[in-house]
C-alpha cells in the first residue's frame, strides 16, 4: 500500500478526514519499484498509457482484477523490462495506491503487447 493510501485509510477510519473511492483505478507498468512514495520509473512514450482495471469485491482479505487487461503494442520503440506494476487513481499523474513486483519480469520490445489475465493481479490486506 502506498504512503498516500495509508494516510487516506488512517484519516478516514480514525475520523480525522473523510475520503471517497476513485471513480476508476488504472494499472501502470514500471521498470523499477515505484516504492510506497510512488517515485519509481513508470514506462513512458512509445504508445504507452495506463489501462483501467476493474476488481471483484474482496473476499478473505484479497481482491483480484475481474477481467483481462491488454495494453496497446509498444510503438516506435521499446518499453524496457517491466519489473513492477502499480495501481493508480488516475489515467495519468494521480496517486499511487498499490504496487508490487512481477513474479517474472517481462521485456517489451517495439511491437510487443503486455497482457494481464483475469485474476492476474491480487491485492491482499495483510
Model-derived regions: residue spans:
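Small cysteine-rich, disulfide-bonded extracellular modules of the LU/uPAR three-finger superfamily
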Residues: 1-85, 89-126
Amino acid at each position: 500500500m502506498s504512503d498516500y493510501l495509508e494516510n487516506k485509510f488512517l484519516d478516514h477510519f480514525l475520523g480525522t478526514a473523510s475520503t471517497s473511492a476513485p471513480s476508476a483505478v488504472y494499472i501502470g507498468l514500471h521498470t523499477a519499484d515505484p516504492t510506497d512514495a510512488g517515485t519509481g520509473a513508470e514506462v513512458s512514450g512509445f504508445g504507452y498509457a495506463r489501462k483501467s482495471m476493474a476488481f471483484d469485491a474482496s473476499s478473505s482479505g484479497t481482491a483480484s482484477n475481474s477481467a483481462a487487461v491488454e495494453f496497446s503494442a509498444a510503438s516506435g520503440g521499446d518499453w524496457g523490462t517491466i519489473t513492477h506494476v502499480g495501481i493508480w487513481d488516475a489515467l495519468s499523474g494521480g496517486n499511487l495506491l498499490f504496487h508490487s513486483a512481477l513474479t517474472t519480469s517481462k521485456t517489451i520490445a517495439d511491437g510487443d503487447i503486455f497482457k494481464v489475465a483475469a485474476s492476474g493481479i491480487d491485492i491482499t490486506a495483510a
